[in-house]
Amino acid sequence: MRSYPAIPRIYAETTLNMLLKRAKKPRVHSIDEYLKDGGYQALEKALNMSPEEIIDWVDKSTLRGRGGAGFPTGKKWKFAVQNPGPRYFICNADESEPGTFKDRIIIERDPHLLIEGIIISSYAIGANEAYIYIRGEYPAGYYILRDAIEEAKKKGFLGKNILGSGFDLEIYVARGAGAYICGEETALIESLEGKRGHPRLKPPYPVQKGLWGKPTVVNNVETIANVPFIISMGWEEYRYIGPSDYAGPKLFPVSGKVKKPGVYELPMNTTLREVIFKYAGGTLGNKKVKAVFSGALDCFSSEELDIPMDYSPLGFGGTGTVIVLTEEDDIVEAALKIAEFYEHETCGQCTPCRVGCYEQANLLEKIYKGEATEQDWEGFDFVNRNIQPTSICGLGAVAGRLIRQTLEKFPEEWEKYRKKSASLPL
């Protein structure tokens, strides 16, 4: 393999030695290193199983999508195979949410784990073509994956009649152009087809009508990387990792005001407090935690640090992204950064999200600068409440959520800004 100097030195730590087993150091692992460590043995085992059996194992493992929604992976695969082929498999590597860099570490350091997972997943759903849609800002990852695919072909793990099984598969890598919205599965499919990355109305869902109008499974990088372990260990043993209903390893990218930012591989019965203080070393300067942002999705206060890092109704959920804010941070300023992110990333397809995200950020900036009138405050509240119920896709559905949560959990901080602008005329 060639040298990839652009690989960042992200700190990685694991208590499970699974997804991050070979990803602790910032370098690419070749196929020979992967094979020495038992790589592609899960594929050999899978090709001696029926596709139906593999889907059943993944379903029984309780593996959930690691891209944010937490939908049961086995159920998604079952829905796909109910529809006649040809079928397609897509790896969603368009990781673009604030503070999220967990998939990157697999792509850039252990690409063959991902490729093995894609081959097994494609075999299970009966797909002969698979696509990796990678974020445009990951140039090293793009070339690493292309080289790794060529390595796998030379060893007989890709192409025609893989390992003499009669199963054929080609994997193609496509680069995004920096649009966060293309992480939404239907917008991703539109982009792959050469169209503008706009989400589709659902139903039909991609498992019914996806790429080129055919049944398509879209799974996240981390989700796919779990598949070889389910096959090699067996679903029963896999379910012993973490809580039985939310089994398997989970990657948590941690950033913000912590001593050891990085990616941590932990079971999902770990608490948010443990992630911050036991693994990430606590806060900088030992300051008090004010809030934790789950990427740009949710806001948790310091009173909620004992929640589990799982997908239960009271769990942390999402992508597992942890952004720590301390008592030194301004919650309104942080909320403004989130509003600006959504303003920049809305695709503009539907009016509620296009106009709503712009107005939300514009009015919030006026609030932050102390220039908001009472009408501005009322307008901000109205816009924030109405983006979600009237938007087409998930981006609009969550564009105001974290900001609303800061209003509810930190009313005293917002009140300070309200008092600043109380003397302004209407």
UniProtKB/Swiss-Prot annotation:
UniProt binding sites for NAD(+): G65, R66, G67, G68, A69, G70, F71, P72, T73, G74
Enzyme class: translocase
Binding site for [4Fe-4S] cluster: C347, C350, C353, C393
EC number: 7.1.1.-
InterPro entries assigned: NADH-UbQ_OxRdtase_51kDa_CS, Nuo51_FMN-bd, Nuo51_FMN-bd_sf, Nuop51_4Fe4S-bd, Nuop51_4Fe4S-bd_sf, Soluble_ligand-bd
PANTHER family referenced in this protein's UniProt entry, alphabetically: NADH-QUINONE OXIDOREDUCTASE SUBUNIT F
Family per similarity comment: Belongs to the complex I 51 kDa subunit family.
Protein's name in the database: NADH-quinone oxidoreductase subunit F
Organism lineage string: Bacteria, Pseudomonadati, Aquificota, Aquificia, Aquificales
Gene for this chain: nuoF
